[in-house]
């Protein structure tokens, strides 16, 4: 289906990005805490935006009119997948920093925030060019908030 195709395309892009981050999670996260490099996150976000806006009508159907269809739980499924990924990233960060794991409800909330960023964008911003400017700011906020949280929690231990 057209709506299912856009969902699959987004899921594939997310999975490819998550696979890269999984490999990076085995690296030196202390460096990431200092640099806050989010170029890969921004690049993937731009690809997702392009896919969403290229098929905006289908994306809007998925997000606003899928009740009662086989895709009714699509957003919840995206959040579930993101939560699993963020749990892995959070556990890698807290382990390397010698910290207690983050609460599951907190990791789940972060996942909602990530997906809600795109839902807000596609339902409220009509032009792809404006969405690209929006996502640059949103990505900066989310990535720096993520790393800032670990810097802050790490400093609280000392």
Where are these regions (language model features)?
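An amphipathic alpha-helix adjacent to DNA-recognition modules
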Residues: 1-19
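Solvent-exposed amphipathic alpha-helical surface segments
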Residues: 13, 17, 21, 85, ...
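Amphipathic alpha-helical segments used for helix-helix packing
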Residues: 18-32, 49-69
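Amphipathic alpha-helical packing segments from all-alpha helical-bundle domains
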Residues: 39, 43-57, 69-94, 105-112
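C-terminal/domain-terminus segments
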Residues: 62-79, 133-146
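Hydrophobic/aromatic-rich alpha-helical bundle segments in the mid-to-C-terminal region
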Residues: 89-142, 150-158
């Amino acid at each position: 289906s057209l709506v299912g195709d856009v969902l699959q395309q987004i899921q594939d892009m997310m999975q490819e990005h998550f696979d890269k981050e999984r490999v990076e999670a085995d690296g030196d996260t202390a460096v990431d805490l200092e640099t806050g490099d989010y170029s890969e996150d921004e690049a993937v976000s731009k690809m997702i935006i392009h896919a969403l806006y290229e098929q905006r009508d289908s994306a809007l159907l998925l997000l606003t009119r899928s009740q009662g269809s086989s895709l009714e739980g699509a957003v919840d499924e995206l959040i579930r997948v993101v939560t699993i990924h963020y749990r892995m990233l959070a556990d890698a960060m807290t382990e390397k920093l010698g910290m207690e794991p983050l609460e599951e409800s907190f990791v789940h909330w972060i996942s909602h925030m990530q997906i809600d960023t795109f839902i807000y964008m596609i339902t409220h911003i009509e032009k792809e060019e404006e969405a690209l400017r929006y996502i640059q700011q949103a990505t900066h906020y989310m990535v720096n908030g993520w790393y800032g949280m670990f810097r802050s929690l790490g400093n609280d231990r000392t």
